[in-house]
Amino acid sequence: MSAFAGADTRGELSTEECRRVVDEIAAVNPNVFLILTGGEPLLRKDLFAIADYAAERRFTVVLGTNGVLLREREAKLMRAHGMLGASISLDSTLSTRHDAFRHQAGAWDGAVRATRVLADEGLDFSLHMSVTDWNVTEIPAMIDLARELGAKVLNFFFLVRTGRGRDLTDIDAAAYERILTYLARAQGEGSGPPSFVQRLLAGARGEDPNRRSSRDPSGVGAVFEDPWSTPVGRADGLLIRAKCAPHFRRILYQLNPDSPLLKNYAHGSCPAGKYYCRITPEADVTPCPYMPVAAGNLRTSSFAELWRDAAVFADLRDPKLGGRCGACEFSKICGGCRCRAYATYGDYLAEDPACAYQPGAHGGDLIELPASLTFGAPVAYELRWDDDARARLQAIPSFARGMVVKAVEAYARGRGERVVTRALLADVRAQWGGRFRPRP
């Protein structure tokens, strides 16, 4: 993300230090999902050597990039060195607006070109859009563009005002509710994009939200012509996710408690400090790219020491939340964005200021998701898995493995199968659209 862009490379981890860190991570968890990002990771001459080293240790390795330097040569190197895909930053459907936001002429063209060379090389990619007040009206168009480009995932990153993001203007809490509801309904939870979202976006464009037309007396279609008003999402193989907005899961639950989109983490919806952390180029370990609270430094402590013993991680794994988040019945599903709380109040356990929900409105009793919808759940076999199937399972990132086992076994039981085999896993992969891609 642009909030952490910079050209100063002094003090960065060397190639050998990166390899040591990979080994230290593998000692804690040998099946890590590793994102090599920046800044711009393609500026590092040793990027593919690091990726290769991690892939050899069975890490799932992907690239996070703005796409400008990603051409056919780089895509081929990605595949050759064990990378399974990339995430591309794209903040507008209009090249001039994206380039202005990224402070780089040609950035939009580079990002779009990168999606094409990745597709040509058979590598999956996701798109990341940083949502602020200036581009929020483009969300429906970005969904359409992501489908057109062939993205597997479209992540909307909602603003946390850190780094360069301090100078940006966030949308207010009421707008969060409306936009997140739109994203839920765009994926089939409900009857389509709600009129209040369409009216919100119309007002943000300076249009009359109450305008009527002869074709649409309600005024909804007058603002949103196709494809704006057409629900899109998983049916076309595109998964839409809201990032840095954990209250999205609360909204999903309110719309449909059985929503398949309610995949969660065992310790709450945000993985920061629980199943996820950032390692900076200078070796600091933080819970998330947007929280500048270091657990320690890998030049003075091992990864295992920091991961197991750091106070900030302990706080986030057993949080004593304050304000509305602490009193909320959705604290297990949501829990608020800890980085936004820190950026606003200087306290990562404070309430999330971007949430408009008042605790108790859904009854007040603590709501928890079943284990079948939980990332980080322990692996519990109820059917027999042959050796080949178990070997394939080891390539699934460990945080998702327990949930994958439950889903695969449910699929097997539905077909009357008593043993999970490699062939059955191939059938499941076809059903899931290849989102999990274990290496052969």
Regions found by a protein language model. Give the residues of each.
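Structural motif corresponding to alpha-helix initiation and N-cap regions
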Residues: T15, R19, R44, R71-E72, ...
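Aromatic/hydrophobic pocket-lining residues that form π-stacking "cages" and hydrophobic walls in ligand
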Residues: V21, I50, A54, A114, ...
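Conserved alpha-helical substructure of the radical SAM core
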Residues: M1-G85, A174
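Flexible mid-to-C-terminal extensions adjoining Fe-S/redox cofactors in radical SAM and related proteins
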Residues: D284-V285, Y290-P378
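Non-catalytic accessory segments flanking P-loop/AAA+ NTPase cores
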Residues: G376-P440
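Conserved, mostly hydrophobic/aromatic
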Residues: L36, A54, L63, I88, ...
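Residues at the N-termini of beta-strands
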Residues: F33, G85, A151-V153, G336
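Radical SAM enzyme [4Fe-4S]-AdoMet core and its adjacent flexible, acidic
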Residues: G6-D8, H81, S89-D91, T96-P271, ...
